[in-house]
């Protein structure tokens, strides 16, 4: 009796708010627990996600070779070997260009330092040479005083390299299995779901993976265009290390909106040191032009409906990923959102296969 009286005394709005509140708290607690588990197994989760992203980029050529009658194992092997050959060739060429262009950059930097020193002495500042030398000596002394920290940083870098090598091996191992038997793996994983929803979950996975394929293809084309534009501009201006800087822009462009800009900042610094403030400002204008071309033409054209994410969601996802997992988190944030955006739409839809009907079934056979 008292319970019913108590319920009757509570306003309906309060009861509904309380019901939603405890459900929200349960969902929030589950998300926190999931993030905690992912953080504990980061050394496994991150390589698996990277392998999934790489598989989305490599599945289309594997499917193309399959459609030409090549055995699946041969197609996977050929695509992987071709990818390694292209990546190794690019890295070798970039490193050789960096080594060849470094002396010229050092010469230009020394010339810029001499020009700045003359300006500080002869310009409005009217500094004495002794003052500038003392400032340089103070900087050298500060480096010596922090030598222990720099040494420990080098040791931690060595440990990081070991972790990176281990992660790279795990990525390669996982990637091979995703390319060779991704569909079987996904079919096996979905057996954990009840039979009544199993088909819908499988369709959601296919839709999410289709968005990953679209995202990987579009991001690769955008990154290639950004790198070509920036590299060509730097080469025309005669900025040293144009090709290595363009390569940094290419890899940075895989983090949407901010990656290419952050990588391009280094190009601005090199242009400033090597060619002066005028060329640095031109480089800034070049980066802005490339960024506008990417935002208003390339991304809407090449991504299309496969990755329809609001720009605010992209920014928030990158920020959250960066806070949770650093650069890797920022790299994986947007494709993760793209995956769940399509997958959830299919899970909530009436026909689990409607949203993936327009995607080539060949591209989905690896999920």
Swiss-Prot record:
It is found in: Cell membrane. It holds the Pfam family AI-2E_transport. It is a multi-pass membrane protein. It comes from the Bacteria. GO terms for cellular component: plasma membrane. Its main location: membrane. Keywords: Cell membrane, Membrane, Transmembrane, Transmembrane helix, Transport. The chain crosses the membrane at residues 18-38, 41-61, 74-94, 161-181, 228-248, 249-269, 270-290, 314-334, 337-357. GO terms for biological process: transmembrane transport. Signal peptide: none annotated. Coiled coil: none annotated. Belongs to the autoinducer-2 exporter (AI-2E) (TC 2.A.86) family. This is Putative transport protein MT0215. It comes from Mycobacterium tuberculosis (strain CDC 1551 / Oshkosh). The lineage of its organism: Bacteria, Bacillati, Actinomycetota, Actinomycetes, Mycobacteriales.
């Amino acid at each position: 009796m008292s319970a019913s009286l108590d319920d009757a005394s509570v306003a309906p709005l309060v009861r509904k708010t309380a019901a939603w509140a405890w459900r929200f708290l349960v969902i929030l607690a589950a998300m926190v627990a999931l993030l905690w588990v992912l953080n504990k197994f980061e050394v496994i989760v991150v390589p698996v996600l990277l392998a999934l992203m790489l598989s989305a980029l490599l599945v289309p050529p594997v499917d193309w070779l399959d459609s030409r009658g090549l055995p699946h194992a041969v197609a996977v092997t050929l695509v992987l070997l071709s990818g390694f050959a292209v990546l190794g060739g690019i890295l070798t060429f970039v490193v050789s260009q960096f080594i060849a262009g470094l002396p010229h950059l050092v010469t230009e930097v020394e010339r810029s330092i001499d020009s700045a020193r003359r300006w500080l002495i002869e310009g409005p500042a009217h500094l004495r040479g002794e003052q500038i030398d003392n400032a340089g000596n103070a900087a050298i002394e500060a480096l010596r005083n922090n030598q222990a920290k720099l040494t420990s940083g080098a040791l931690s870098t060595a440990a990081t390299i070991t972790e990176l090598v281990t992660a790279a091996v795990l990525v390669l191992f996982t990637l091979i299995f995703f390319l060779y038997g991704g569909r079987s793996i996904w079919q096996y994983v979905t057996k954990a779901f009840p039979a009544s929803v199993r088909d819908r979950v499988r369709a959601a996975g296919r839709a999410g993976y289709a968005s990953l394929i679209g995202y990987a293809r579009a991001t690769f084309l955008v990154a290639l265009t950004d790198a070509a534009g920036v590299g060509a501009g730097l080469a025309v201006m005669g900025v040293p290390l144009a090709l290595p800087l363009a390569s940094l822009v290419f890899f940075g462009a895989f983090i949407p909106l901010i990656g290419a800009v952050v990588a391009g900042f280094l190009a601005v610094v090199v242009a400033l040191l090597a060619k002066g403030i005028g060329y640095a400002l031109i480089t800034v204008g070049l980066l802005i032009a490339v960024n506008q071309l990417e935002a208003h033409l390339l991304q809407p054209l090449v991504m299309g409906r496969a990755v329809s994410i609001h720009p605010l969601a992209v920014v928030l996802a990158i920020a959250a990923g960066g806070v949770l997992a650093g650069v890797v988190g920022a790299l994986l944030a947007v494709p993760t959102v793209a995956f769940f955006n399509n997958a959830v739409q299919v899970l909530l839809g009436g026909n689990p296969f409607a949203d993936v009907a327009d995607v080539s079934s060949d591209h989905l056979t690896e999920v």
